[in-house]
């Protein structure tokens, strides 16, 4: 449910774009993301760092889009965010020797170090490619095509890659699940 909730601002952006224009849609995106963050803080008493960073990028690039009445800024936001994600994954692996993917998922999944590294690199590569593809779509094709790509294309690619990542680590999951089950067993049983 939480993952669906995070897509609400994107859905609002799409619907408002289809019924008005990119500038009003950008304003709706800023407001809906701000409300989502406020709701998360109210509900959980905290907000995830990635949500704050993404909102900050939307706020900066979205405000520039609206104030300067130039959609180039909101289009660049996608590229910059994906490039930063890619860079963060690479830096975490090569400079800190602690892949972000592992830091995010190690409480849920136990994988060998080389698998964490491969997964981290795969996601870094995906984000780098998506960053580059966004530049092409945003600046070579129509605004409507870019919005459709941003909302549906990037989402579909990310979901497909998540599925592929799951298939890649699948053979390691039974051992992890077994350990979790035995760790959670009630000693009185």
From Swiss-Prot:
It comes from the Bacteria. The chain crosses the membrane at residues 4-24, 53-73, 76-96, 121-141, 149-169. It is found in: Cell inner membrane. One of its GO terms (cellular component) is plasma membrane. It is a multi-pass membrane protein. Keywords: Cell inner membrane, Cell membrane, Membrane, Transmembrane, Transmembrane helix. Signal peptide: none annotated. Its main location: membrane. Plays a role in cell envelope biogenesis, maintenance of cell envelope integrity and membrane homeostasis. Belongs to the YciB family. PANTHER family: INNER MEMBRANE-SPANNING PROTEIN YCIB, INTRACELLULAR SEPTATION PROTEIN A-RELATED. This is Inner membrane-spanning protein YciB.
């Amino acid at each position: 449910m939480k993952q669906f909730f995070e897509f609400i601002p994107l859905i609002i952006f799409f619907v408002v774009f289809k019924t008005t224009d990119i500038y009003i849609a950008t304003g709706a995106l800023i407001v809906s993301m701000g409300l989502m963050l406020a709701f998360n803080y109210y509900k959980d008493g905290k907000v995830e760092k990635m949500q704050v960073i993404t909102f900050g990028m939307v706020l900066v690039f979205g405000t520039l889009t609206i104030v300067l009445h130039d959609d180039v800024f909101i289009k660049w936001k996608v590229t910059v965010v994906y490039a930063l994600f890619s860079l963060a994954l690479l830096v975490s692996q090569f400079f800190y020797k602690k892949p972000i993917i592992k830091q995010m998922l190690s409480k849920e999944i136990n994988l060998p170090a080389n698998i964490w590294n491969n997964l981290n690199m795969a996601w870094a590569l995906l984000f780098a490619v998506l960053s580059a593809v966004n530049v092409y779509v945003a600046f070579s094709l129509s605004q409507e095509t870019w919005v459709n790509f941003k909302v549906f294309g990037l989402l579909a690619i990310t979901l497909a890659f998540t599925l592929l990542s799951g298939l890649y680590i699948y053979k390691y999951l039974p051992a992890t699940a077994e350990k979790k089950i035995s760790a959670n067993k009630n000693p009185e049983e």
